[in-house]
Amino acid sequence: MEALAKSLGVNIKTDSPIKKILVNQLDEAYGIRANGENHYCDYVLSGADYHHTETLLDEDFRQYSEAYWEAKTFAPSSLLFYVGFNKKLKNVNHHTLFFDVDFGLHAQDIYDNAKWPEDPLFYASFPSITDESSAPNGKEAGIFLIPLAPGLEDTPELRETYFNKIMTRFETLTSQKVCDDILFKESYCVNDFIKDYNSYKGNAYGMANTLLQTAFLRPKLKSKKVKKLFFTGQL
């Protein structure tokens, strides 16, 4: 994508977090401010989180209040673990969903009563099973994912607790010991989605696709208050 964009004349600037969307007296977006420098343009097209994009505008130019966003239903966040194992694992596939506990209870903890699930369902991916280049010879690369409600407390202690929960079950369900063969482990959760993507409450997928958040009931792609401002992100 980068090569294609550059071939079409796109100038990509990295390490340039946007601090403000510039709006003129005609209520037109005419640029952005990043790293203390203004960059001018004919249109502003934001692929960032919609709520975050609006915080880059002066309050009078924002279409939706904090109460509006608070009332919306968002897709789950996730707790992810990226794990390297010092051996090839048995009884696993490239993609596996572990539904060995009550799906309904986990769903309630995401959508009805937001909290950390007592017994979470989880997903595991081992790309090195089908792409040998994704792990060294004789090793295994694994990704584990637990769906979570957005906006939950996120601490290193909670992450470790849930890693131990799912790994205990994983060992039982696949009839093997793996925890003593972990070479590398990195986690990613609510706070990281907020820090890296400015994602509202750390959600992973944007607004949920509920009946009352479908089609014209979703936030508009074109700003009603600022001309030449369009949204594509987290919708």
Residue ranges and their predicted role:
Residues N86-N191:
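C-terminal segments that line or cap access tunnels to active or ligand-binding sites in enzymes
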Residues D60-R62, G142-L148, K228-F230:
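Short acidic (Asp/Glu) and glycine-rich catalytic loops that position anionic groups and cofactors
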Residues L4-L8, G47, L56, K165, ...:
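Generic, well-ordered alpha-helical scaffold segments in large soluble proteins
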Residues A5-I18:
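A conserved beta-strand/loop element that lines the FAD pocket in flavoprotein oxidoreductases
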Residues K19-A135:
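Mid-domain catalytic core of redox enzymes
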Residues L45, V83, F144, F170, ...:
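Hydrophobic, well-ordered secondary-structure elements that form the walls
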Residues Y123, Q176-L235:
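A glycine-rich dinucleotide-binding beta-alpha-beta segment and adjacent secondary-structure elements
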